[in-house]
């Protein structure tokens, strides 16, 4: 299951390593 990284990526990319943008929210891969 996808684990949210606590970041949004609507206007800026994800900063936490290993996280990617999905549906405007950063998720851990």
From Swiss-Prot:
Give the record's keywords alphabetically: Disulfide bond, Knottin, Plant defense
Q: Annotated cross-link Cyclopeptide (Ser-Asn) - which positions? A: 1-29
The UniProt PTM text for this protein says: This is a cyclic peptide.
Q: Which GO BP annotation is one of this protein's?
A: defense response
Disulphide bonds in the chain: 5-19, 9-21, 14-26
Query: Which Pfam families does the record match to this protein?
Result: Cyclotide (PF03784)
Q: What is known of its domains?
A: The presence of a 'disulfide through disulfide knot' structurally defines this protein as a knottin.
What function does the entry list? Probably participates in a plant defense mechanism.
Q: Can you tell me which family this protein belongs to?
A: Belongs to the cyclotide family. Bracelet subfamily.
- Name the chain's protein: Cycloviolacin-H2
